[in-house]
Amino acid sequence: MSRQTATALPTGTSKCPPSQRVPALTGTTASNNDLASLFECPVCFDYVLPPILQCQSGHLVCSNCRPKLTCCPTCRGPLGSIRNLAMEKVANSVLFPCKYASSGCEITLPHTEKAEHEELCEFRPYSCPCPGASCKWQGSLDAVMPHLMHQHKSITTLQGEDIVFLATDINLPGAVDWVMMQSCFGFHFMLVLEKQEKYDGHQQFFAIVQLIGTRKQAENFAYRLELNGHRRRLTWEATPRSIHEGIATAIMNSDCLVFDTSIAQLFAENGNLGINVTISMC
């Protein structure tokens, strides 16, 4: 079977777990929402969660806004440091909406689980998946591909589950990234080859695949990276990362295809390195 080949030019230097819907502890959904509204911060409209401090008149402000204020935003009195134990007890019986409810998340949960859920919530804004820190774009999952097509036009896209990712000029000095897209099974995958400078000029390459999709969708796929040539073969197989979690942690933990300069030279041709990439459904 013939493989498509794309050339990736160096780009420069560098799930939300299926939360169980918790039944209302007391009363109806409407009454729970009424209770939750009592905890809204008057500044940012997020929720004031334990430990809860009030001003002398009993007004509440969330822990994020409180350090930025010099007086109570409601009564203009001193903020004070009075602990409101009664409201803390009420908070323990209220189910709070996720902060990304306006983006579509319907989960309500106790305040003790709220921060952990929001860290993994699939409705949290997605960051641009391109390596490096130059692009600060954030948006919904549906907007990621349009963003890449309009703002990162240099990235090549190949169709099919079996392609060749050709990284050019791998001998360039310093930290360098190579990126391309692969489209198959109705999804888009981003292939990344990253070169890092280590100690004493030692260089390491990290190759990984991430899905333009959620963590749950990523679990339906597997990818295989293969360096093949001169009667040698080096392979790596894994589940693609979702762009929701990114690739930084995987690279830091070497949870990807890792090889150094000497290995790269065994497979390179004229300073270019071809990586066979195969995507399959689980």
Swiss-Prot record:
The keyword Glycosyltransferase does not apply. Induction: May be induced by p53/TP53, suggesting that it may be required to modulate p53/TP53 response. The relevance of such activity in vivo is however unclear and may not exist. Induced by ATF4 in response to the unfolded protein response (UPR). Pfam families: Sina_RING (PF21362), Sina_TRAF (PF03145), Sina_ZnF (PF21361). Residues 1-22 are annotated as: Disordered. Pathway: Protein modification; protein ubiquitination. Keywords: Apoptosis, Cell cycle, Cytoplasm, Developmental protein, Differentiation, Metal-binding, Nucleus, Phosphoprotein, Spermatogenesis, Transferase, Ubl conjugation pathway, Zinc, Zinc-finger. Homodimer. Component of some large E3 complex composed of UBE2D1, SIAH1, CACYBP/SIP, SKP1, APC and TBL1X. Interacts with UBE2I. Interacts with alpha-tubulin. Interacts with PEG10, which may inhibit its activity. Interacts with PEG3. Interacts with group 1 glutamate receptors GRM1 and GRM5. Interacts with DAB1, which may inhibit its activity. Interacts with UBE2E2. Interacts with SNCAIP. Interacts with KHDRBS3. Interacts with SNCAIP. Interacts with HIPK2; the interaction is promoted by DAZAP2 and results in SIAH1-mediated ubiquitination and subsequent proteasomal degradation of HIPK2. This is E3 ubiquitin-protein ligase SIAH1A. It comes from Mus musculus. The lineage of its organism: Eukaryota, Metazoa, Chordata, Craniata, Vertebrata.
